Amino acid sequence: MKKIILDIQSDIHAHTMERMLMQKLDDCHVVISESPDATVEWCKTHRPDVLLMDVKAYSPWMFKERMAIRDKVERNTENCRVILFVDDDTDGELTEKVRQAKREGLIDAFLFGSVSENYFASVIDSV
């Protein structure tokens, strides 16, 4: 069973992603983090295969803050893949930071808000 933790700013988007992943992936368990402050603890407790976090231009979802969470999760949770989710239509600079993090091996994958549900689920399933 693939375990996935979602750390998404909007509860509506998080629950939509949860439902979509449960429909698209055969065997997965999705946990929604209550807040960025709780994500590291959720990862320690649930030992996920994937941590998906959205990245925004404001706190507490800023790129730097997400990388700090990634660092803590990497130290405490073996084999957890980190995927960043970014709205590629609104902030080109932020999108480039996320791309660069992938190039440097800091994250395992990234997704744009404009991708299809099938592609979204396939990327999460493939890491």
Q: What are the language-model segments listed below?
A:
Residues 51, 82, 109-110:
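Two-component signal transduction core modules
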Residues 97-108:
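As written
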Residues 44-46, 71-79, 104:
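Conserved phosphotransfer cores of two-component systems
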Residues 7-9:
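Conserved acidic carboxylate
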Residues 34-50, 58-60:
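Acidic, metal-coordinating helix/loop segments flanking the phosphotransfer/catalytic sites
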Residues 51-76, 86-97:
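Conserved phosphotransfer microenvironments
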Residues 11-36:
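Two-component/phosphorelay signaling modules centered on CheY-like receiver
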Residues 112-124:
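C-terminal output helix
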